[in-house]
Amino acid sequence: MVMLESGFTWLPAFLWRLHKFWRGVRMETPWVDRAPLEIVRSNIRFSLQPVDAPPEPETLNRLFDHMQSDELILFSTDYPHWQFDGDEVLPQGLSPDLVRKIMVDNPMATYSRLSQSVRA
């Protein structure tokens, strides 16, 4: 599942809360055998836009660390909406490796049929 235009900066706090709640009810739900973070990492992706993070690069990088995954975010532009970010689509301060994951690797892994059309 891909969540578009939902933002992603709320995710670390939400996952922390889910994990805490899950630990408290594990005895009552033995069929839920994986932690919420694992379930989200294997099944859900989020679009980059809108970036609702503070403009400081350190804060954004810390958010990615708290999510414990660089595979959750997919490139998006929010075009053609009026609040489209234009040339400032990518937040400042992301490492080249993370930019490649967001713009190429994560979309190719999420939309596996894309890789077939690229090869053709």
Where are these regions (language model features)?
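Aromatic-lined glycan-binding groove of carbohydrate-active enzymes
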Residues: 1-43
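Mid-to-C-terminal alpha-helical segments outside catalytic/metal-binding sites
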Residues: 10, 27-35, 45, 49-50, ...
